[in-house]
Amino acid sequence: MKNEMLALILAGGQGTRLGKLTQSIAKPAVQFGGRYRIIDFALSNCANSGINNVGVITQYQPLELNTHIGNGSSWGLDGIDSGVTVLQPYSATEGNRWFQGTSHAIYQNIDYIDRINPEYVLILSGDHIYKMNYDDMLQTHKDNLASLTVAVLDVPLKEASRFGIMNTDSNDRIVEFEEKPEHPKSTKASMGIYIFDWKRLRTVLIDGEKNGIDMSDFGKNVIPAYLESGERVYTYNFDGYWKDVGTIESLWEANMEYIGEDNKLHSRDRSWKIYSKNLIAPPNFMTEDANVKDSLVVDGCFVAGNVEHSILSTNVQVKPNAIIKDSFVMSGATIGEGAKINRAIIGEDAVIGDGVVIDGSKEVEVIGYKEVAGVPNED
């Protein structure tokens, strides 16, 4: 079996900075934009880029993520020559197989990669919101005769110290990599998206393990090793919308940016669709007293209150006189009569009691999965 490029999505992160939202699910399984989960963006990019085989590497709380991905049919990745394979840690005769880092997760799955036998491997994070044509990145990789290509995004200089920064020459060849530098020399921030020549990466990972050299992380170990050995390492410059939604604030911001006709993600672009697992729900119902403005309301919602600049996911109930503003409400949540919610993220199947006030005007408030805030009305 031969495929030119295999995609490997790193989806095992716990996402501790998302607090209550990831207590029972992996970060890539967190809901986004009303009808999606975060991993849908990486999977859809793969499908739209013509990548036939995708490995999803999981670790922390994988059940919801595994169920969501299923056999890959939602992304058209269930054909004779295509597929999604969920790769989890396992025990072997040589010992524990728990993943120790990003590149260690790849090393532990060499047998799977060898079965696909790709010429190139595309490494992706499963927790970013963006649209990218990976085929364009691969062409750049080939044109540069690169051994490794790193996707980068120009960021404001004041924010550059939060990222791994790539310093390049005039031909976009990387001459230096700095991990979260205090005084950055450039603004080219790594997006955590890499294309490697598989044979070379395979050798580097195996030799590192054999010789006791730490090669467990791409940013800390592998990229510096490539640069030190003189490998041809280049950037792929991306200028579209990209958001790391690893914090409560950034997840809320991304959802708010998703609303409206002028959303930066161009969600209505039919030439590059974002696919997800289809959920069957009845049509929305809004009472005559409902007031919905500048909001995204997904199927199955019952709205009898007021909703402004917010997202209501599948099967959300908003009872009379409730007010929701600048908030993201996940599927199955119930908002009680007269409740007031401002700048908040309400988790799946959460219940907000009658008259409860959740005010995130100073800091975005979060109600977790199945959490009950206040005493719900038994009716």
From Swiss-Prot:
MF (Gene Ontology): ATP binding; glucose-1-phosphate adenylyltransferase activity
HAMAP family assigned: GlgC
Role of this protein: Involved in the biosynthesis of ADP-glucose, a building block required for the elongation reactions to produce glycogen. Catalyzes the reaction between ATP and alpha-D-glucose 1-phosphate (G1P) to produce pyrophosphate and ADP-Glc.
Annotated gene: glgC
Catalyzed reactions: alpha-D-glucose 1-phosphate + ATP + H(+) = ADP-alpha-D-glucose + diphosphate
Family of this protein: Belongs to the bacterial/plant glucose-1-phosphate adenylyltransferase family.
Enzyme class: transferase
EC number(s) on file: 2.7.7.27
Name recorded for this polypeptide: Glucose-1-phosphate adenylyltransferase
Domain of life: Bacteria
GO biological process, one term: glycogen biosynthetic process
Organism of provenance: Streptococcus agalactiae serotype V (strain ATCC BAA-611 / 2603 V/R)
PANTHER family hit by this protein: GLUCOSE-1-PHOSPHATE ADENYLYLTRANSFERASE, GLUCOSE-1-PHOSPHATE ADENYLYLTRANSFERASE-RELATED
InterPro entries: ADP-Glc_PPase, ADP_Glu_pyroP_CS, GlgC_bac, GlmU/GlgC-like_hexapep, NTP_transferase_dom, Nucleotide-diphossugar_trans, Trimer_LpxA-like_sf
PROSITE patterns in UniProt: ADP_GLC_PYROPHOSPH_1 (PS00808), ADP_GLC_PYROPHOSPH_2 (PS00809), ADP_GLC_PYROPHOSPH_3 (PS00810)
